[in-house]
């Protein structure tokens, strides 16, 4: 296979990934592949571009490093072109409502007829099978959170609240990335393709697993947080200092002993309620839980964030300031690791945003291109799989493909 023009870099150099999906979840998987060196082709509708393009800045991050193909993959010669593209593809990711591709005649078996080694990742809200009541429903971030039991665990005691921004989309997209890579590893061993069924609600069910296990195995429902504090453990969660907020985790024998001395609770150490060797203070089961919170709140309220961080560093208590977005760029850790970076958009503007993660030492990722315009690479991609100028012109004339104006 001849690859499209792009630099060679990253651990996935030489891998061809194609994705069909809009907004966040499916495309986030494609974004990860593209930043790790894969050749990633983004399929868009001919008549209507991906709705993410209406956003002013986010698409420049989420669609960087991609090749843009505008093709009607379900109709006539457009379908033929898509299936021909699959012959040279390692991983195909589609995000839609349930078995939408199968309903339109593009089943796993059809794809494997054209490429027996193809890894296929289906990403949907409720999965490829189940009850019709659910499998054909649309789903977004909040839908997946609500249906999975994740949303009900978040928020405050007075009201549940979804986790933002778009947590279920990103978790589901990353699940598609890792699952597809696992499948590709096996395919290269066996020569046999794989199909992956990723249901967003199941991803969030797994992400919300921690406290659920107490219910499934004992009937205990974990309460939601109170003002950002851990529902079970005192000294864990969000706290207010004299000049802003911190998060902390008061965990460990030495940490509890020394912290209690600072906040005036040394006298309860070694009691039956806080015996020697205590590593966590349960805010409900320990009678002193409310007192610990009261004393800690009072002590933190009289100290600045800098003072608290310095003291907690001495005591080896995990703690961090809650940074505002404007504070990120100037933070020395961000600067040292170049966590925020800049790149050029296709129209020559400078865009700033999160850098590639994680950081590969020997085969680092790279930003080599901004977001392509609608249909920008259609001609190049079709030529790459054997189409002539005349063939492409015919597809465009029939409304089955769009090339850049």
UniProtKB/Swiss-Prot annotation:
Keywords: Cytoplasm, Transferase. It is an enzyme of class 2 (transferase). CoA binds at residues 97, 104. It is found in: Cytoplasm. Pathway: Amine and polyamine metabolism; carnitine metabolism. It catalyses: crotonobetainyl-CoA + (R)-carnitine = crotonobetaine + (R)-carnitinyl-CoA; 4-(trimethylamino)butanoyl-CoA + (R)-carnitine = (R)-carnitinyl-CoA + 4-(trimethylamino)butanoate. One of its GO terms (cellular component) is cytoplasm. It comes from the Bacteria. The active site is at residue 169. Transmembrane segments: none annotated. GO terms for molecular function: L-carnitine CoA-transferase activity. Homodimer. HAMAP family: CaiB. Catalyzes the reversible transfer of the CoA moiety from gamma-butyrobetainyl-CoA to L-carnitine to generate L-carnitinyl-CoA and gamma-butyrobetaine. Is also able to catalyze the reversible transfer of the CoA moiety from gamma-butyrobetainyl-CoA or L-carnitinyl-CoA to crotonobetaine to generate crotonobetainyl-CoA. This is L-carnitine CoA-transferase. It comes from Salmonella typhimurium (strain LT2 / SGSC1412 / ATCC 700720).
